[in-house]
């Protein structure tokens, strides 16, 4: 048989009909093939083999799952939703299946697992393959775990950050000063960004804010903003919004400024890992890619916040400043109180309701959210040169009080696609104080967990409404917080969790 004939036969033998299974494997492409499939047998494929799928001009690397029985028809390859969207084949199209290319970068992952330092070239190789979709979730988990804890030193963190910036888009706004902010997180309801951006933009500074969705929390900034306006903007739409209004609040994943970070987050979330080096690289790579020059970092500190002590905040802050300097960012820090939730709502819609109350100047607006946002906005106004040192807070307060911030927020929402109404849930359960006394402490982590079990952020209106704060006197039977759920089952689930845990609100009984 001629070489040409052999190649034609091989092409035929490795082709299968594509079938959309409808299986959601999150963002990991999975292909399903029968155990008696001629392609499996001829190529020597086994479960977990990494294969290259090609349909026309499009290709994707996927993990193989082998199926027994007749769930799949002979000659068919079942594609998960992620694999189907990656290939976008026509119905019943042929796809070619072959071994995926060898990943040389995995040697660097193994080296890190065994405690070796990685240089810039190693991080560039790993992150390049991550961003290209060549890593399975198993490989991603190995890399994330190997870098967790204190396993990344300063030079490695700089190299990882630069590698993450290099594989994404980097925006240029044509301005000498572009400001941004980030909160390290771990504090329920701390949705200051939706107040800070319109205040700062109303003062003439440029603030293109890309925000994340929830990783381990009941709401991310993008989740809360999405209640009020579209956040899945592409780069062109983001640029139009910023040029028209001076600011935006969009989901970073939609503009793919740091695509490697978007991939890593999908395994960090179930592993509940958010180590210092990876946190710094994640935050600053997105800030650099967004074209920012001056960045304010909010570091809430509290026994149940993400950062537990002032010493830990200072250590993390130093790393942020040093890495920022290395990649050309001026980073400023503000260590804030992380003892209790900010505002009343915990969950996308409940937090959005609080934000609107502050912007509209409502009498019942949560004052702690207002004051925290004003301090951060004041810092940014001074950092960006829009206010002299020491006068940023006053300017921010004036802009909020006279309605300029509310007008700017409405303009940003309209530019992003329109201001929406805040949804509410049909199911609620009030949790009351068991004894009279004074609120001594609130467990932020357990409260956030209760909000997640109630359905947040997947159900945007779900979450928790907080009715008491640390230091407040309470009577037995007085409401402490309310669970909000979209379904009766989720409400029961969250309520059972609260009932079987130590009290989220610690009450000191008064003599």
From Swiss-Prot:
* Similarity annotation: Belongs to the thymidine/pyrimidine-nucleoside phosphorylase family. Type 2 subfamily.
Q: Which UniProt keywords apply?
A: Glycosyltransferase, Transferase
Stretches assigned to coiled coil: none
Pfam families reported in the protein's UniProt record: Glycos_trans_3N, Glycos_transf_3, PYNP_C
| Identification of the protein by name | Putative thymidine phosphorylase 1
Identify the PANTHER family for this entry.
THYMIDINE PHOSPHORYLASE
What are the boundaries of the signal sequence? none
What SMART domains has UniProt attached to this entry? PYNP_C
The record's annotation in InterPro entries points to: Glycosyl_Trfase_fam3, Glycosyl_Trfase_fam3_N_dom, Glycosyl_Trfase_fam3_N_dom_sf, Nuc_phospho_transferase, PYNP-like_C_sf, PYNP_C, Pyrmidine_PPase_CS, Thym_Pase_Put
List the EC numbers from the record. 2.4.2.4
Which molecular-function annotations from GO does this UniProt entry contain?
1,4-alpha-oligoglucan phosphorylase activity; thymidine phosphorylase activity
List the catalytic activities from the record.
thymidine + phosphate = 2-deoxy-alpha-D-ribose 1-phosphate + thymine
Q: Name one GO cellular component term.
A: cytosol
Name any Gene Ontology BP term: pyrimidine nucleoside metabolic process
Got any disulfides in this one, which pairs?
none
